[in-house]
Curated annotation (Swiss-Prot):
Residues the entry annotates as binding [4Fe-4S] cluster: C586, C595
Gene Ontology CC terms, in alphabetical order: photosystem I; plasma membrane-derived thylakoid membrane
Location of this chain's protein in the cell: Cellular thylakoid membrane
EC class (word): oxidoreductase
Pfam families recorded: PsaA_PsaB
Domain of life of the source: Bacteria
Similarity comment text for this entry: Belongs to the PsaA/PsaB family.
Species lineage: Bacteria, Bacillati, Cyanobacteriota, Cyanophyceae, Synechococcales
HAMAP family: PSI_PsaA
Residues that coordinate or bind chlorophyll a': H688
Protein name: Photosystem I P700 chlorophyll a apoprotein A1
Main localization category: membrane
């Protein structure tokens, strides 16, 4: 067959408009300047709510896609500025208020702290003894471990980084202003996906990974090799001088001297010649493939992670040369999508290119779904393959990082549902999507949703039924009739099979590796300083049961979000939903039973199920790790676990979860008064209050409050102190938004205080 050369694309040019929008502080100083109605100023208290709701809804400011794109682009720089300021604050605390040097000297006994409370009226009780003579609040962000892995050896270096982050923040703020007011990209620049993919893949991910690999190789590895030797009690000698403490370690730039660094890694003597002559094995002492964990630190081998980032860099730099721009070579995304047809999928992906280059909601939705999923995968990798030194034995940090990444993932995935529904309402054009995949999914949405609903009902009744059965049998004193590892077994055979494959496979796939990918699949206990860093996680009946609760709650969350997206424009009940918009409380007066059908309401309801779902995930993790993994290694080699292995028997019943997990482990937060964790006791109480406060918004109607307000306004009129701005009750949607925000805030802070008071006390 002959292959005709691909059509040359139109030449790509980075085109900008000069000075498109004047810089006017006078205009910005006027609240609501972006909306004609809001700019008139407040008539009623609803104004302030609408101001917040619409400030960042760029679609409502203008219908010009180019201007919307520029606003989003500019806002990204603003977001980056905020992130740099936040990071600067974290590094500044590490530099100014922390025991980083003390922790570095003795990471197995000293706990990380980067905040010291000032004594005003007794709060200094919060400054607990974290070891090494330092008193402060124990932090659980994992920053100390990250800093050690990066090669920081003193607080001054953290200071410099904090200042550098502020400089970067200033640069980002300037860039955000410059690319909106001085040189704003044209729409075609935002829509040029091939160039965008090439630059993001090769530049951001490829060169980003390469520069990090370079930092790891030239700074992190020598510093960490010296620190590990000190911690192992066998300090190394450099240029005839024993490196006995972190203070003796040469500064990063000194390792540019090949004669110095090659005393630690002889491979550096090979120089770049070995690279160009393909004699890559010369670098095998600092680019390794060991597998498993470093026995001194309980973290991944940093020589493995340097190798990993170098490999990732190569992959992404190659990937960044795949898409066709000015050189008539490579892929065209439009061609790929339009060629993507199956035997049963009609026009396939035709039309999706146009959607993803004109609807940023559609684009954002996909990105949120992927990023949310990645965040949840990261949560699991944090304990399966702990990446930083001494992270795995810092149990409060392990629990915090897992919980954090799980919740972030949940919020992002709900956000994916939200923006998919907004896309359907605001940007979807049925005439341009005839018989493509999106159209076909929408046409058989009833089949999809009814089947998904059936799955949810099946999972819910069966998984819950197993627990109810066990509670009943235990209450009747018939343990032999329970589902358990010692009676009627429900072993997770597929999960055990996967664990076994992963434990055995590296023997064949990586014969030179020292250990398998992760100890959680099977292998030996890795202990650091007498504490378990990693151990095989044995799964049994209790895990099988709670796993099916996970399956149930995740499927219900997916059902709510997917129903919201697929029925965002129309349904049998409300055929003209597309005209009502993304958020509306009900289909007007005179149509009862049409409330909570808008796209927004599905996001609202999905948030509750997301929270419900992920609470059980983090409870499962917290209890399982305390019961079966975390603990102290006794002199005879056995492990005394924090919760003494009670998960397998107690987690079989609902009563067990309530009594042996929630109630038993809440004793630390409930009895924290008068101790350095007493703040968690107050947060625990306060967060319960915030959570209960949310119910006032969720369980009452707007009319009740409007009636009350009018009576209060009457009293003010009597006293001639009536306000100029007329008070109004929250709209139905606003009430629900305030309700769900407090519900989630209260729930998350309750869990946070419960987890940390417990694990700081026992971990």
């Amino acid at each position: 067959m002959t292959i005709s050369p691909p059509e040359r694309e139109a030449k790509v040019k980075a085109t900008v408009d000069k000075n498109p929008v004047p810089t006017s502080f006078e205009k910005w100083g006027k609240p609501g300047h972006f909306d004609r109605t809001l700019a008139k100023g407040p008539k009623t208290t609803t104004w302030i709510w609408n101001l917040h709701a619409n400030a960042h809804d760029f679609d409502s400011h203008t219908s010009d896609l180019e201007d919307i794109s520029r606003k989003i682009f500019s806002a990204h720089f603003g977001h980056l500025a905020v992130i740099f300021i936040w990071l600067s604050g974290a590094y500044f605390h590490g530099a100014r208020f922390s025991n980083f040097s003390g922790w570095l000297a003795d990471p197995t006994h000293v706990k990380p702290s980067a905040q010291v409370v000032w004594p005003i009226f007794g709060q200094e009780i919060l400054n607990g003894d974290v070891g090494g003579g330092f008193h402060g609040i124990q932090i659980t962000s994992g920053l100390f471990q990250l800093w050690r892995a990066s090669g920081y050896t003193n607080e001054f270096q953290l200071y410099v980084t904090a200042i550098g982050a502020l400089v970067m923040a200033g640069l980002m703020l300037f860039a955000g202003w410059f690319h909106y007011h001085k040189a704003a990209p044209k729409l075609e620049w935002f829509q040029n996906v091939e160039s965008m993919l090439n630059h993001h893949l090769a530049g951001l991910l490829g060169l980003g990974s390469l520069s990090w690999a370079g930092h790891q190789i030239h700074v992190s590895l020598p510093v960490n090799k010296l620190l590990d030797a000190i911690d192992a009690g066998e300090p190394l000698v450099l240029n005839g001088k024993t490196i006995a403490s972190a203070a003796d370690i040469p500064l990063p730039h000194e390792f540019l001297d090949v004669s110095l660094i090659s005393q630690l890694f002889p491979g550096f003597e090979a120089g770049v010649k070995a690279f160009f002559t393909l004699n890559w094995s010369a670098y095998a002492d600092f680019l390794t493939f060991k597998g498993g964990l470093n026995p001194v630190t309980g973290g991944l081998w940093l020589t493995d992670t340097a190798h990993h980032h170098l490999a990732i860099a190569v992959l992404f730099i190659v990937a960044g040369h795949m898409y066709r721009t000015n050189w008539g070579i490579g892929h065209s995304l439009k061609e790929i999508l339009e060629a993507h047809k199956g035997p049963f999928t009609g026009q396939g992906h035709k039309g999706l290119y146009e959607i993803l280059t004109t609807s940023w909601h559609a684009q954002l939705s996909i990105n949120l779904a992927i990023l949310g999923s990645i965040s949840i995968i990261v949560a699991h990798h944090m304990y399966a393959m702990p990446p930083y030194p001494y992270l795995a034995t810092d149990y409060p940090t392990m629990l915090s990082l897992f919980t954090h990444h799980i919740w972030i993932g949940g919020f992002l995935i709900v956000g994916a549902g939200a923006h998919a529904a907004i896309f359907m309402v605001r940007d979807y054009d049925p005439a341009k999507n005839v018989d493509n995949l999106l159209d076909r999914v929408l046409r058989h949405r009833d089949a999809i949703i009814s089947h998904l609903n059936w799955v949810c009902i099946w999972l819910g009744f069966h998984s819950f039924g197993l627990y109810i059965h066990n509670d009943t049998m235990r209450a009747l004193g018939r343990p032999q009739d329970m589902f358990s590892d010692s009676a009627i077994q429900l072993q997770p055979i597929f999960a055990q099979w996967i664990q076994n494959i992963h434990a055995l496979a590296p023997g064949n796939t990586a014969p030179n590796a020292l250990a398998s990918v992760s100890q959680v699949f099977g292998g030996d206990v890795v202990a650091v300083g007498g504490k378990v860093a990693a151990a095989p996680i044995v799964l049994g009946t209790a895990d099988f049961m709670v796993h099916h609760i996970h399956a149930f709650t995740i499927h219900v969350t997916a059902l709510i979000l997917l129903k919201g997206v697929l029925y965002a424009r129309s349904s049998r009940l409300v055929p003209d939903k597309a005209n009502l918009g993304f958020r509306f409380p009900c289909d007007g007066p005179g149509r009862g039973g049409t409330c909570q059908v808008s796209g927004w309401d599905h996001v609202f309801l999905g948030l509750f199920w997301m929270y419900n779902s992920l609470s059980i995930v983090i409870f499962h993790y917290s209890w399982k790790m305390q019961s079966d993994v975390w603990g102290s290694v006794l002199p005879d080699g056995s492990v005394a676990h924090i919760a003494n292995g009670n998960f397998a028997q107690s987690a079989l019943t609902i009563n067990g979860w309530l009594r042996d997990f929630l109630w038993a482990q809440a004793s630390q937060v409930i009895t924290s008064y008068g101790s350095s964790t007493s703040a968690y006791g107050l947060l625990f109480l306060g967060a319960h209050f915030v959570w209960a406060f949310s119910l006032m918004f969720l369980f009452s109607g707007r009319g009740y409050w409007q009636e009350l307000i009018e009576s209060i306004v009457w009293a003010h009129n009597k006293l001639k102190v009536a306000p100029a701005i007329q008070p109004r009750a929250l709209s139905i949607i606003q009430g629900r938004a305030v309700g769900v925000a407090h519900y989630l805030l209260g729930g998350i802070v309750t869990t946070w205080s419960f987890f940390l008071a417990r694990i700081i006390a026992v971990g």
